[in-house]
Every structure is written in structure tokens, then in C-alpha cells.
């Protein structure tokens, strides 16, 4: 019997239907010598730390780094997963041959291999079904040419290294930074890929926040209704352009050069997943996750090919199928396909290139047409279909005309007078033949991706070299503008190139090898950062939150938030797939990196040799008797950071943190509006001090202090699970849990216990066997004990 494993039930149904397997069993299909069963994604996972060593269950700095000698696997915890795994194990054990039919990619391979290992069937012979669409024809061809399972060992090793390295780096970094810098009950989640992505967003937001607009002036002149600009560029002062303006006013403008060239703009390359996500975000505002979800659904319904691809080309052997596919697509896109001569298709190496196809070719429609689509799915399908159709259109031909002109000023007669001619330039664009761009003629420039855009049309008069005449020079003032915040399209682009900005198609392809994440994981990385409140969506932009910015400020180890470092790791994983890099060497590098994290976290988070710069004028801050003030106070700057804020003494160390990182590292017992609560002190760019409750930033509710701590000088603060001392970070262990022996302890009870040393007789406690009893709570040497009532 041959057992086929798919990644999800819907794919199992499709394969069963195609192979005429009609007998439905509990957890599998059976017939014609096959049993087809399925997973629900990752049914098998890496074990938790305490499953290797019970000591690792408790979070402590002493136990770090946590690195298992050998990773183990466990079944996912939910009942449905356990039941299905047992079915798979029974079928695998009895099988003569196993066929892996999970998604044809890194994660699909990992899902299968982990299950194969967990079921103890590693010695069983197995084959690999590798297909790029789920049409019946593709499935039949795939089963007719099954691959040897071990041919994909490189893919599995890369997936295994990715899984284990994420576990090691993520777990150790998260525990390290939570233990060192987290507030009570809070969690600082750090990931091998997510943290560098967060750092990119934080850096962009800082560039915008710190941007100072500068005035500039441009010299233009209007000649025969055409706008010419001065070739010397912008001026950073008004005097120079005014001097030139005075020199050329009233003198003739002469055309010195008229040059034209024809530009051929080829159709855009086909979509890979990242480009599809970027395009749908620009066109329709879809998130990366929404686009992937729609594309995956269209793939599972057999309307699109495999979406999780990083290729933008097709293979040579697909050429014969292009005409039949275009003929099929006429049903929905007859008007767009009509101009194409299907008997003389343009099949260039730019689109059909085996060397540029990795695991899967570009995303294209299949011959299985959808019925009436609506909503986001329709937008995704139409985008893929139009991009595919555009590949067979002729190029867009444009005529680019560059015109140079000049004005000869009078002879020099004073300081600042121009020497020689004042030169100007203008450029015009005319479309001779729109070619493929007719498919996008109704869209604005902002809706088109860069590969679908050309120069805006600008028609010039018929200039002749040597002609001259009057003109109207002018000065146009302006201000520099800040960088734009990331939207999903621009963030995906920067993730794809590991933090490097690039528009060139060839260079972009090279940088893809060192991207942040993979096409199939980038959407989930963005969603995880949003879920963890490190970034937020504001309309179409992605902005860092206070929590996200604070986390990045805490991480002293630049490599942990480095896009280039993570990009290098991704490149090595790709090489492991290709058997070009030793997986053991990769894991050794990851382990060495993790071992150094603890040492690097001891580095100062700020420059302790200086206080910092004034938020108002950027001059150095100096220490005074009552506060920390701006050194430029004689020039009128009035910034001062007082040495006591909200009842909290501000030490020099805390002032460094506020001036350099905008907030204190630790929380303090802040007194504000007759309340005392645990909060971090903050300083904004206007020089105003404030405080941030842990409730909003660390997801743990901190209320007013209910009493003084009986063990130290701290305050007893109400948190989610307990009444605890605000000085817990400094070693105070005073805690009254909110639930004791199944009874809820109210704030009033805790206050009485703290003020008098005991509560009254309390009813409603329950023993481990469920027997109710009454007792008093007493405070003995800072510990809560029970004084049992006598009958």
C-alpha cells in the first residue's frame, strides 16, 4: 500500500478525486492501492525547554543560554491534532511506500519530515510529489514523475536549520531581555527575523521624527510655454539665485541642443509573491497577509499556480502551453487578449528562463477558470491575469527629447556676477506606441508599480537649435520634505533586499538571496509585530509604537537587530538547500552568536560619558544644582530636566536614559493626581516630561499603590495577579497573590493584612480535595501564612 500525506484535507480531496479514490475513512481516503491522509499544518513541533531539562522551565539568567544537545519533537497539544497524528502513524507503519504531497517548499518539506521522524518511519522508502498547481493535469503529471524523496534532503536541512535557529535565538533573546528589562508580568519578544524588521521601521520613524526641513530655491525660466530648470540644481540660499535672476532678466534665451532618443520599455516581469503583495498594496490597499490568503485560496481552488514563489520567470518547457492558456483566458479577458497574435507569441528569454526559476515558476493563471469572483480574490486574480497577458504584448515605445538652453549675462560688473552662460534644461516625453501599457491606461501613477510605470507624458514645442527669444525667469522657493513612512509595499521591498534600497531589476534579483525572511513568511512577520503591539497600522502606513521603539533602544547588540546579519543567515539557508553550505557549521554559528548575547546585553544602552543633547536646540546638556539644563542657556534656551519628577529622584544615569533614549529603562513609583503607580519616566522632543504606565506599554495593569511595603521603602502595587512591591527589580520579594487556596483576595483584604499584620476570619478557602474551610491570613517576616480557625 502507498500512503500519501498532504498538508491539509482539501488537497487530499483534490488528489483523491483525480486518482479516482472514493472510499472515505476516518482521517484518510482509500482505494486503487493508495491511502491518502493529511496534516493540519505543523502537527509536530520542537519540544519546550523544560521537556529537555526541568530546570529550564523557570526563567532565570543563570540558565541562559538554553541550547539542547539534540532537538526533540512532540505532537501538537490539541486533541484533533493528536488523533490525526495517530491515524498517520498507523498508516505509515503499515505502508510499503510513502509519498510526500505537502506544499512544494521549505515549510511543506519540514511538516512532512517532522511527521516522518515522529512516527519513527525514517527508514521507509518515500517519494516526493512536486507540482506548481493543483489542476487535475498537473496532479497526474506529478504522479507520473514522482521524485526520490532524498533528492530534497537539502531543502529539509535548510528548513530544519531555520526551525532550530529560530528556537535558539528567539527563546534565549526573549528570556534574556525580559528578565533584564521587562516590567512585572511583561514580555519582550525577540525573533531572529522580526526584530531586524522592527529595527528598520523604528529607524525610519526616527529619521522622520528628527527631520528638520530646510529652505531651498530653484531657478526656472519659461520659454515658449516650456518650463526649463537651471542645471546647477537647487540653491540653499536666496542671494545666489536672485543674483542670477538679475543677470538674465531681459536677455534672450537661446536653444543650444535638441536631442531625441527612442526608449523601449519591456512588459513587467511576472509576479512572484512579494511583488504581488507590493502591487496589491499599492493598487487596492490590501495587506500582505490578505494578498497571500487570497492567492493561497485561488491556488487551492486550482485557479492560480503555487503562490509562495520567489521566481518571476517561467521554464522553457511551458512554452507550448501558453497559447491554450491564453485561449482559455479569453472567456474573462477577451478584450485584452484580442490584440495578441496567438500563432506568433513573443516567447523571450526574459520571461522563459530556466536559470531564473528556483523551486517554483512565477505566479500565473491556470486553465481552470474561476466563476464569478468578488472582493479581494477578484482583485488578486485580475492582477495576476493582466500581468501574464502583458508579457505577450509589444514593448511601450517612447520618444524622449532633451532640450538645453542658455542665457548669456552681460559683462561682469560686480561681486557675485556670473562668469559664462547660465544653462537650463527640460525634458519631454511622447508615447509613439503604448504597447502593453494600454492594459493599465485607466490607473493613476500611484496605483502602478514601478515596473509598470514610465515617464509622465510631457509634450514640448518643436524647438530648433540656435533659435532664441524672450523668456520669463523666476525663482521657486521650497522646503525639503521628510522621508515617507513605510507602507506594506515599501516594507516588503526593503525586507526583500535586507535593508538595501534598489530599483534595478537585475540587482534586486541578486539581493533576494539575502532578504529578511522568505516570500511565504514576510506577511506573517508583519502581522506578528502588529499583534505584539510593536508596530501599528495607521491608514496605509506602518509605524512603530512606543513599545517597539523602546525594545529597539534596549537592544545594545547591533547584530541582534541587524538586517544585513539576518540577510546573511537567509543566504546561508538558501545555500544549504543547494548543498553548498554545511548545516552543522550554520548551527554552530547560530549557537556561538547566541552565547554572546548575554555578554553583549551588559553593554551600556547609552553613552555614559555625556548626558545627552537638548531636545530643543541639540546643544549639550550639563548638570546643575537642581536639574540638568541646556548649555546654551545664555542664548535663550530654557530647557531643563529637574532632578525630581513626579516625586521620583532623577539620577545622572536616569537623565542619560531620558536624553538619549526618551525614557527610563526601569519603572518607578510615580506620584500623580493623588495616585501612586508604577511607570517609566519619558521625555519628548519638545522637552516635556511625562510617564508611561505599564498598563499601556507592557500589557500588565498597574493601579495605585495600596500600602507601603513592610520589607523595604517601596510601595505595594496592584498588578494583574498579585499585590507586589514596586522595588521587585531591586530584590524585594514582598507579594500577596490575588488568589489563595481558590479564594480571591481583594484590595481591601490586602490593605488590612499589610497595615495590621493579619486579616479577619475569611471564609471560602478550598483544600486540594475541594473541602471548604475558613482561616485568617497573617504576615510573618514578609510571607503570607494561614491561621486556621478552630471549630
Q: Can you say where each PLM-predicted feature lies in the sequence?
A:
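C-terminal or mid-to-C-terminal helical accessory/interaction module adjacent to the motor/catalytic core
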Residues: 138-223, 260-264
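Conserved short loop/turn motifs at secondary-structure junctions
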Residues: 1, 103-104, 184-187, 260-269, ...
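Amphipathic alpha-helical transducer elements in NTP-driven molecular machines
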Residues: 9-16, 33-36, 40, 78-92, ...
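Basic, low-complexity terminal or inter-domain segments flanking catalytic cores
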Residues: 2, 81, 118, 174, ...
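Metal- or metallocofactor-binding catalytic centers and their adjacent structured scaffolds
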Residues: 238-271, 277
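Intrinsically disordered, low-complexity regulatory segments
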Residues: 1-163, 167-169, 444, 482
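Glycine-biased, low-complexity coil/linker segments
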Residues: 8, 414-416, 466
Amino acid at each position: 500500500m502507498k500512503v500519501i500525506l498532504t498538508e491539509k484535507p482539501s488537497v487530499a480531496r483534490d488528489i483523491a478525486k483525480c486518482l479516482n479514490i472514493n472510499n472515505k475513512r476516518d482521517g484518510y481516503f482509500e482505494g486503487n492501492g493508495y491511502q491518502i491522509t493529511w496534516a493540519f499544518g505543523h502537527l509536530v513541533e520542537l519540544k519546550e525547554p523544560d521537556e529537555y531539562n526541568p530546570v529550564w522551565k523557570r526563567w532565570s539568567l543563570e540558565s541562559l543560554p538554553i541550547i539542547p544537545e539534540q532537538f526533540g519533537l512532540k505532537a501538537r497539544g490539541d486533541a484533533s491534532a493528536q488523533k490525526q497524528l495517530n491515524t498517520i502513524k498507523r498508516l505509515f507503519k503499515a505502508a510499503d511506500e510513502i509519498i510526500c504531497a505537502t506544499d512544494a517548499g521549505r515549510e511543506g518539506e519540514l511538516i512532512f519530515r517532522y511527521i516522518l521522524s515522529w512516527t519513527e518511519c525514517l527508514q521507509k522508502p518515500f517519494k516526493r510529489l512536486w507540482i506548481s498547481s493543483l489542476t487535475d493535469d498537473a496532479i497526474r503529471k506529478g504522479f507520473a514523475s514522482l521524485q526520490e524523496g532524498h533528492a530534497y534532503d537539502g531543502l529539509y536541512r535548510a528548513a530544519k536549520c531555520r526551525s532550530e535557529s529560530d528556537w535558539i535565538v528567539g527563546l534565549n533573546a526573549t528570556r534574556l531581555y525580559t528578565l533584564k528589562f521587562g516590567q512585572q508580568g511583561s514580555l519582550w519578544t525577540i525573533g531572529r527575523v522580526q526584530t531586524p524588521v522592527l529595527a528598520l521601521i523604528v529607524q525610519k520613524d526616527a529619521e522622520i521624527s528628527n527631520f528638520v526641513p530646510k529652505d531651498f530655491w530653484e531657478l526656472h525660466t519659461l520659454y515658449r510655454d516650456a518650463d526649463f530648470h537651471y542645471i546647477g540644481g537647487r540653491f540653499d540660499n536666496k542671494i545666489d539665485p536672485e543674483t542670477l535672476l538679475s543677470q538674465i532678466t531681459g536677455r534672450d534665451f537661446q536653444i543650444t541642443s535638441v536631442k531625441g532618443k527612442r526608449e523601449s520599455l519591456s512588459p513587467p516581469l511576472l509576479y512572484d509573491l512579494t511583488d504581488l503583495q507590493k502591487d496589491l498594496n499599492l493598487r487596492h490597499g490590501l495587506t500582505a497577509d490578505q494578498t497571500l490568503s487570497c492567492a493561497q485560496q485561488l491556488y487551492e481552488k486550482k485557479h492560480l499556480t503555487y503562490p509562495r514563489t520567489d521566481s518571476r520567470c517561467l521554464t522553457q518547457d511551458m512554452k507550448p502551453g501558453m497559447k491554450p492558456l491564453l485561449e482559455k483566458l479569453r472567456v474573462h479577458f477577451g478584450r485584452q487578449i484580442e490584440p495578441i497574435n496567438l500563432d506568433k507569441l513573443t516567447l523571450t528569454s526574459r520571461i522563459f528562463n530556466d536559470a531564473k526559476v528556483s523551486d517554483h515558476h512565477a505566479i500565473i493563471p491556470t486553465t481552470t477558470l474561476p466563476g464569478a469572483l468578488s472582493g479581494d480574490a477578484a482583485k488578486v486574480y485580475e492582477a495576476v491575469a493582466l500581468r501574464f497577458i502583458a508579457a505577450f504584448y509589444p514593448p511601450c515605445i517612447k520618444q524622449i527629447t532633451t532640450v538645453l538652453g542658455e542665457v548669456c549675462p552681460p559683462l561682469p560688473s560686480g561681486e557675485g556676477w556670473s562668469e559664462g552662460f547660465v544653462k537650463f534644461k527640460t525634458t519631454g516625453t511622447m508615447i509613439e506606441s503604448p504597447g502593453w501599457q494600454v492594459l493599465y491606461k485607466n490607473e493613476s501613477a500611484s496605483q502602478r508599480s514601478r515596473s509598470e510605470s514610465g515617464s509622465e507624458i510631457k509634450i514640448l514645442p518643436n524647438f530648433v537649435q540656435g533659435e532664441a527669444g524672450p523668456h520669463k525667469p523666476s525663482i521657486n522657493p521650497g522646503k525639503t520634505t521628510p522621508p515617507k513612512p513605510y507602507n506594506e509595499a515599501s516594507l516588503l521591498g526593503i525586507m526583500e533586499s535586507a535593508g538595501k534600497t534598489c530599483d534595478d531589476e537585475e540587482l534586486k534579483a541578486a539581493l533576494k538571496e539575502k532578504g529578511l525572511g522568505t516570500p511565504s513568511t514576510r506577511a506573517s512577520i508583519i502581522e506578528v509585530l502588529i499583534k505584539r503591539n510593536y508596530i501599528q497600522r495607521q491608514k496605509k502606513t506602518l509605524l512603530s509604537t512606543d513599545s517597539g521603539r523602546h525594545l529597539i533602544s534596549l537592544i545594545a547588540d547591533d547584530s541582534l537587530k541587524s538586517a544585513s546579519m539576518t540577510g546573511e543567515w537567509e543566504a546561508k539557508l538558501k545555500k544549504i538547500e543547494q548543498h553548498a553550505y554545511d548545516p552543522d557549521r550554520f548551527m554552530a554559528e547560530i549557537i556561538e552568536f547566541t552565547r554572546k548575547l548575554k555578554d553583549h546585553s551588559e553593554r551600556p544602552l547609552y553613552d555614559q560619558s555625556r548626558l545627552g543633547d537638548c531636545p530643543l536646540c541639540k546643544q549639550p546638556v550639563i548638570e546643575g544644582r537642581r536639574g540638568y539644563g541646556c548649555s546654551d542657556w545664555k542664548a535663550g534656551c530654557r530647557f531643563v530636566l529637574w532632578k525630581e519628577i513626579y516625586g521620583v529622584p532623577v539620577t545622572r544615569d536616569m537623565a542619560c536614559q531620558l536624553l538619549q533614549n526618551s525614557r527610563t529603562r526601569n519603572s518607578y513609583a510615580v506620584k500623580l493626581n493623588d495616585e501612586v503607580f508604577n511607570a517609566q519616566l519619558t521625555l519628548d522632543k519638545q522637552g516635556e516630561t511625562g510617564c508611561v504606565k505599564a498598563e499601556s506599554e507592557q500589557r500588565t495593569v498597574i493601579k495605585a499603590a495600596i500600602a507601603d511595603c513592610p520589607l523595604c521603602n517601596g510601595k505595594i502595587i496592584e498588578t494583574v495577579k498579585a499585590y507586589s512591591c514596586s522595588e521587585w527589580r531591586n530584590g524585594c520579594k514582598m507579594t500577596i497573590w490575588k488568589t489563595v487556596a481558590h479564594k480571591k483576595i481583594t484590595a481591601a483584604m490586602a490593605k488590612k493584612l499589610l497595615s495590621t499584620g493579619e486579616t479577619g476570619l475569611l471564609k471560602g478557602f478550598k483544600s486540594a480535595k475541594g473541602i471548604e474551610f475558613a482561616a485568617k491570613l497573617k504576615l510573618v517576616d514578609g510571607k503570607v501564612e494561614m491561621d486556621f480557625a478552630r471549630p
